[in-house]
A protein has these predicted regions:
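Register-specific beta-strand positions within repetitive beta-rich fiber domains
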Residues: 1-37
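Extracellular receptor-binding modules and their adjoining Ser/Thr/Gly/Asp/Asn-rich linkers
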Residues: 15, 21, 33-95, 102-108, ...
Length: 148
């Protein structure tokens, strides 16, 4: 059992087997590995962030665990979909990708359709029976690392 009640800094790897409770600020400069239960009031990741622009038909490269992809002006016909590949060296085939729309575009949704080691696909779909009109979309992504 590990209990941290004050501010603590670990410069390398912190490996815990068993229950862990962190009530102070804990900074790990390397890898935090927990086998068991980790209880924390909040967890903050101070990793890299990326923003890239694309034309909705070109693939993009965003090598970080989270970031924002900004499209150039585009439009989708009624019930039309278009996908593009996000090349990302952080992604493994078993990871989970979460998308949120930073800019709201009525009836145009973003979904992840394929995850492979080194890349994932984003599908833009117009769910309406009318054309979408011109739009510029900002999509936030986050990679949740999962064990194989």
């Amino acid at each position: 059992t590990l209990a941290v009640t004050d501010n603590t800094t670990v410069g390398g790897t912190l490996a815990v087997t068993g229950a862990s409770t962190l009530t102070g600020n804990t900074t790990v400069g390397g890898t935090l590995g927990v086998t068991g239960t980790l209880t924390a009031s909040s967890i903050r990741f101070n990793g890299s962030r990326t923003s890239v622009s694309h034309s909705n038909t070109n693939d993009v490269t965003a090598n970080s665990l989270f970031g924002t992809i900004t499209s150039t002006q585009d439009a989708l016909q009624n019930h039309e979909s278009r996908s593009f590949i996000v090349n990302n060296s952080e992604v493994e085939a078993w990871d989970v990708i979460i998308l949120t729309n930073q800019s709201q575009v009525t009836n145009v949704i973003s979904t992840v359709t394929n995850i492979t080691s080194g890349a994932f696909d984003i599908l833009l779909s117009n769910t309406s029976s009318s054309p979408s009109g011109s739009f510029k979309k900002k999509i936030n992504f986050a990679v949740i690392k999962c064990p194989p």
